[in-house]
């Protein structure tokens, strides 16, 4: 039977100094021998998804203490991708994931904590904490801050729903008046919480449910709603139970690697494809799987993408539905219920509540449950009041959306598309694959061929798009923006949004070894691997080269002969130490980012560190 990790610092005369310091934090004799549980918070006033988390750590801690544990809270950093977008700040976003994972490991191992409750929410914070949890493999429960309410405003005598992306598009559209742009900007992000669409933050919080590491409702219940408080209270109680099960009963089923098994990862990716989640989730699931020592690769994702239909469509792929609507339709478990009935899930998995998938669906799938409290929870809706306070309202929808023929969530028979919301493409300049969010691609451009317009930075591409140099039919190629080449693998939300604002959203393609915001839609293909800075063929594309994209057949091709590609590769190598670097880009890169780049792998590996360079 494993002994509590914390006993290392709380037992024995030689630990008198450590105990003295523990006492200075408020611990007493009666606390030594109890499990020490880290409450890993991520409160910050920089990020709307985290601005309301300050007191929620205390809420969890109080429940831990009441249940027989000792709670110790610490904070991680949190980058707001939307605020960091469109300038040099975006270079720091993806690297912050590694810093978060490392900081959690450092704090938990340095102080010998026995278990964790991770209070996350936004884009890199949930993945970073997930990576740390699977790396450490001690009992853990995730409880996130919850989604933002959708913005709403009246345009042309019609009430429309809004989000961050609408503000960006309207702000760059020369045809939109200053008054209308200002109106949209002021209405787009009305409350605390993670941005209201199926962007990266909400996608990842949904996936922690599918992995079994968070409670039902975690991915979709609004940040502002009073019902969300119960998730935090339950997490504090449940983590003590899980911790005692492992340390006192030698029950390894309480450990995250046994909950988030390969079968659970396959279920999470199946959910992701069915709900048209952010392409960033691919990057983060691949990274998390490596931390869990699970053999889960782009090949597995490709296989799933070929058989899983799209059963849910949410902003940015449509303005009709946002996360508040997904919740009304049954949330993550509403989608999983339909996938289960279609025979597309592994049923032999459990969650942090100790329930198998069939047991969870029986209790929480709104189409089958007899539990009125569950139905009431899924009727939790928006209040439409600007606020930065968690749990500040208790409004409810009059009814649930259980219409699986024409509602937000569909059954297999009435799927939005027989093809899922994400696809992996392969070709002669994406030998290791690339990702497209098919949920956001118009049917008219699922097959697309055009001449390349090549840019070696996001900034140059934006200038060209807004300057009218990109025209209908072009394939915009932005390279040297991968994990190593950026460095930091910037999101390309501004280029894709500006294509829309210039009327080219359905008339152009954009391809990059960088990545996209969860708010991106359109024919936007990212994560091209190998990246340009790692010798990828994307570095050899020239202006005017023809690129053919065929999403139904999962193909992307540079229409050049092998001989021509080989000749260009030879010319690139002849540049010596300048080979596989941008020719004319002026970018200041800090030593911190250079350190990140020196170990970064391409996107097909999750952009994690190259362990071979560290002797691992």
Curated annotation (Swiss-Prot):
PANTHER family: D-XYLONATE DEHYDRATASE (PTHR43661), D-XYLONATE DEHYDRATASE YAGF-RELATED (PTHR43661:SF3). The active site is at 517 (proton acceptor). NCBIfam families: ilvD, PRK12448.1. The modification N6-carboxylysine is found at residue 124. Mg(2+) binds at residues 81, 123-124, 491. GO terms for molecular function: 2 iron, 2 sulfur cluster binding; dihydroxy-acid dehydratase activity; magnesium ion binding. Transmembrane segments: none annotated. Keywords: 2Fe-2S, Amino-acid biosynthesis, Branched-chain amino acid biosynthesis, Iron, Iron-sulfur, Lyase, Magnesium, Metal-binding. SUPFAM superfamilies: IlvD/EDD N-terminal domain-like, LeuD/IlvD-like. It catalyses: (2R)-2,3-dihydroxy-3-methylbutanoate = 3-methyl-2-oxobutanoate + H2O; (2R,3R)-2,3-dihydroxy-3-methylpentanoate = (S)-3-methyl-2-oxopentanoate + H2O. The gene is ilvD. This is Dihydroxy-acid dehydratase. Pathway: Amino-acid biosynthesis; L-isoleucine biosynthesis; L-isoleucine from 2-oxobutanoate: step 3/4; Amino-acid biosynthesis; L-valine biosynthesis; L-valine from pyruvate: step 3/4. Its EC number is 4.2.1.9. It comes from the Bacteria. [2Fe-2S] cluster binds at residues 122, 195. Binds 1 [2Fe-2S] cluster per subunit. This cluster acts as a Lewis acid cofactor.
């Amino acid at each position: 039977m494993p002994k509590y990790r914390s006993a290392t610092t709380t037992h024995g005369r030689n630990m008198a100094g450590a105990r003295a310091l523990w006492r200075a934090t408020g611990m007493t004799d009666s606390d030594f021998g109890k499990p020490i549980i880290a409450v890993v918070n991520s409160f910050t006033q920089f990020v709307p998804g985290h601005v309301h988390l300050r007191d929620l750590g205390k809420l969890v801690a109080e429940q831990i203490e009441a249940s027989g544990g000792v709670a110790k809270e610490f904070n991680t950093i949190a980058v707001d991708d939307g605020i960091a977008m469109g300038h040099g700040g975006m270079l720091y976003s993806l690297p912050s994931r590694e810093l978060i994972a490392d900081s959690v490991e450092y704090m938990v191992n340095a102080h010998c904590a026995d278990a964790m409750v991770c209070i996350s929410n936004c884009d890199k914070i949930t993945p970073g904490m997930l990576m740390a949890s699977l790396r450490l493999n001690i009992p853990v429960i995730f409880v996130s801050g919850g989604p933002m309410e959708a913005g709403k405003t009246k345009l042309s005598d019609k009430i429309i729903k809004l989000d961050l992306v609408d503000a960006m598009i309207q702000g760059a559209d020369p045809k939109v008046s200053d008054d209308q742009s200002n109106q949209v900007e002021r209405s787009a992000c009305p409350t605390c919480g993670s941005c209201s669409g199926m962007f990266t933050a909400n996608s990842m919080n949904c996936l922690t449910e599918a992995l079994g590491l968070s409670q039902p409702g975690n991915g979709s219940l609004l940040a502002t709603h009073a019902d969300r408080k119960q998730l935090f209270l339950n997490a504090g109680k449940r983590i003590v139970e899980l911790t005692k099960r492992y340390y006192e009963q030698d029950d390894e089923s309480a450990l995250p690697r046994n909950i988030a098994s390969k079968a659970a990862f396959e279920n999470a990716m199946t959910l992701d494809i069915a709900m048209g989640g952010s392409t960033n989730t691919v990057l983060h699931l691949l990274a998390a799987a490596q931390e869990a020592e699970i053999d889960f690769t782009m090949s597995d994702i490709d296989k799933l993408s070929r058989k899983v239909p799209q059963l849910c469509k949410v902003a940015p792929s449509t303005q009709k539905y946002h996360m508040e609507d997904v919740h009304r339709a049954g949330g993550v478990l509403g989608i999983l219920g339909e996938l289960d009935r279609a025979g597309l899930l592994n049923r032999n998995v459990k969650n942090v509540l100790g329930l198998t998938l069939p047991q969870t669906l029986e209790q929480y799938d709104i189409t089958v449950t007899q539990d009125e409290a569950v139905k009431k929870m899924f009727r939790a809706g928006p209040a439409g009041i600007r606020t930065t306070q968690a749990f500040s309202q208790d409004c409810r929808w009059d009814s649930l959306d259980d219409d699986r023929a024409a509602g937000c969530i569909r059954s297999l028979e009435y799927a939005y598309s027989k093809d899922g919301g994400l696809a992996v493409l392969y070709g002669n300049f994406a030998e290791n694959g690339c990702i497209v969010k098919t949920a956001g691609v118009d049917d008219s451009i699922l097959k697309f061929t055009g001449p390349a317009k090549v840019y070696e930075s996001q900034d140059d591409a934006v200038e060209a798009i807004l300057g009218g140099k990109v025209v209908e039919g072009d394939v915009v190629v932005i390279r040297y923006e991968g994990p190593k080449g950026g460095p930091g693998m910037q999101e390309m939300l501004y280029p894709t949004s500006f294509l829309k604002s210039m009327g080219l959203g359905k008339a152009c393609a954009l391809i990059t070894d960088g990545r996209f915001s969860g708010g991106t839609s359109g024919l936007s293909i990212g994560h091209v691997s190998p990246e340009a800075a790692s010798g990828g063929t994307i570095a050899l594309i020239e202006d005017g080269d023809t690129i053919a994209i065929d999403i139904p057949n999962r193909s992307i091709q540079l229409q050049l002969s092998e001989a021509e590609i080989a000749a260009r590769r030879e010319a690139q190598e002849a540049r010596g130490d300048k080979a596989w670097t941008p020719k004319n880009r002026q970018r200041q890169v800090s030593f911190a980012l250079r350190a990140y780049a020196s170990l970064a792998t391409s996107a097909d590996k999750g952009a994690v560190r190259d362990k071979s360079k560290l002797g691992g």
